Amino acid sequence: MSEHETAGEGRFNSIEIRVLGSLIEKQATSPESYPLTLNALVLACNQKTSREPVMNLTQGQVGQALRALEGQDLTRLQMGSRADRWEQRVDKALELVPAQLVLMGLMFLRGPQTLNELLTRSNRLHDFDDTEQIQHQLERLISRDLALHLPRQAGQREDRYTHALGDPAEIEAILAARQQEGGARSSGASVSEERIEALEARIAALEARLAELEG
């Protein structure tokens, strides 16, 4: 086990998040080539489609992330005669059902998304009937501090959801950027202070939990 006391309960950098999301996606969409070789995983991480933001990672960066995640039981190396391959173990480490794993994977790859975006983008990964099913699974993830609900900003029509496994500072940056974006679209409108306070309280709780794990 690494610096965190419990597998999967740590906070991860953007490269580790991209690695996990790519493994989850390819497990569902390319089962014939999964688990992935390091080279295939680098290509998956650097895809120019279905990735926000687009990244340009090296084999060294991806390999380092894999080793860090392996230390927390979130990835596993399968040694082969022709090539070593990597698989994700997020579902086992975090005790996720398939629907939750897919949603976490989508949020790992594309950040904050609306219910309708998650429904559309999950069509090759899982068979959700409607947005209500997605919202139900997201609420279960939120109750475990694995996901965040981001109330819609001024000029937006829908709330958004994102994972809560990134660095707390990065999560705060997402919230700040969304608030600024909303203000730019409608300078006369302001975000509900109660909603902001609720999000700030959740961030504080996440930071406190991280401090306990690192202690």
From Swiss-Prot:
InterPro entries: DUF480, WH-like_DNA-bd_sf, WH_DNA-bd_sf
SUPFAM superfamilies for the chain: Winged helix' DNA-binding domain
Signal peptide residues on this chain, from the entry's feature table: none
Top-level taxon of origin: Bacteria
PANTHER family the record matches: UPF0502 PROTEIN YCEH
Annotated family: Belongs to the UPF0502 family.
Stated name of the protein: UPF0502 protein PputGB1_3531
Taxon lineage: Bacteria, Pseudomonadati, Pseudomonadota, Gammaproteobacteria, Pseudomonadales
